[in-house]
Amino acid sequence: CLACGVNYMDTANYEPENTDDPEWRAIYEKRCKEAGFSAYFDYSWQWAYAKKFEEAGLTALLGSGFDPGVTQAYCAYAKKHEFDTIDTIDILDCNGGDHGYAFATNFNPEINLREVSAPGSYWENGHWVEIPAMSIKREYNFDQVGDKDMYLLHHEEIESLAKNIPEAKRIRFFMTFGQ
């Protein structure tokens, strides 16, 4: 987009196609040590372009789907208009459909499977806490959908919320799945 002089928009953050690429691997391993989470996807690659886009007079809108996207907009609105401070953010993503299959997803199943098989993580007291995949389970009653099991996962909006709502002591993301 920079080379063509056009604005950029995506619905989720960067995830490399080749995780064995030595250049990407070196940056990834450094980030794992410094940040404390091991997800293959994160915003660091895209945030590194911020100054270049600004200097070019271009806009790059990252994570403009629902989660990430709408979830951050709701949190920003709540911070600006509803609360003096935000202590805890829990995002509860519920897929109420089943598509007639045991495993229901409302987006790319390959990405969904990578999310559920990767270690989970959340932001607490200024640092990342990483946990084994799907090791934190909660049940929640979703209006019009009913009781659903949900699992704590790593999800990219936690990164941007931790950066933009630094007073939050804990930020977590939970997702439901078909049983």
Name each model-derived stretch.
Residues L2-F107:
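Glycine-/Pro-rich loop/turn segments that contact NAD(P) or position catalytic residues
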Residues H81-Q179:
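C-terminal catalytic/substrate-binding lobe primarily of soluble NAD(P)-dependent oxidoreductases
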